[in-house]
Amino acid sequence: MNGDPGESGHIPGARVVAAYKGGSQDIPSSADRVEQYAAEIRAKYGVEIVPDIATLLTKVDAVLLESGDGRAHLSQARPVIAAHKPLFIDKPLASTLEDAREIARLAAEAHVPWFSSSSLRFGAIGASMKFPDVTGVFTWGPGPFEPHHYLDLSWYAVHPIEVLYTIMGRGCVSVTRTAGEFGDVIVGRWADGRLGTVNAVRPYSDYGVVVIRGREVVESRPKASAAVDYRALVVEMVKFFQTGAPPVPNEETLEMFAFMDAAQKSKEQGGKAVSLR
């Protein structure tokens, strides 16, 4: 957005003018990089670094909430919603189902548009594997945990879960989860009888999906590089800020968190089937 308009990857229509650093001291990937990133966007792109969210809100038309820590998102979203600024919240929307629903409730009461998404929804995998006759889906991707996120799948496995919902849509009624040392397998049962499976691989893996269409089985290509391209998501952000129309239904995002909540409870109960709440 802030690059040279002549560059091939430039995205017109919006510009980042100010940022608040934030950061989480108990997450090394946040604490160890926030100062470096702040210095880079200030020097390279002319972004003003401000001391707090309140100051930020006086300088912008819309907000990208890019904190990697889902625990912080509710408290950070509150002032943005109160200021009636359109809001994109990067993954994970929250670290609990309750926080996710509270963000949605506050935004609905204030009539503030918002959305949250993994970049994989709009990348090569998500965009190429949507078919009208899907009867089953198997997705996989990295599944490392952070101990402070109650919904442990929300930390990283949210990516393949987002792909699952991109293809399957809403309608999951129950979830079972089998936990292992090298990964977890989560199976959702949809109300229409379809099954959607996620393999959260540890420590890391590429991304991919297999779609069942009657007798035909389709596997995604490529699995990794194009799948994590962030540009397509940024294009959707700019459209959203211009129109106020979320590219992902809020209800679908909230069901994803109900899916992860049920998966967490299934894990705690030794793999029993748990209904979404």
Set out the residue ranges of the language-model regions.
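C-terminal helix-rich "cap/oligomerization" subdomain common to oxidoreductases
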Residues: 55, 64, 240-277
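Short loop/edge segments at beta-strand edges and connector loops
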Residues: 51, 89, 116-118, 176-179
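Alpha-helical hinge/cap motifs
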Residues: 61, 84-86, 90-93, 244
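A general structural signal for well-ordered alpha-helical segments in protein cores
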Residues: 38, 160-161, 230, 234, ...
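Interdomain hinge/lid region at the active-site interface
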Residues: 205-245
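A contiguous active-site-proximal alpha/beta segment in oxidoreductase catalytic domains
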Residues: 88, 93-150, 160
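N-terminal glycine-/serine-/threonine-rich beta1-alpha1-beta2 phosphate-ribose binding loop
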Residues: 1-83, 105-109, 170, 269, ...
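Rossmann-like dinucleotide-binding domain that binds NAD(P)(H)
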Residues: 140-206, 251-258
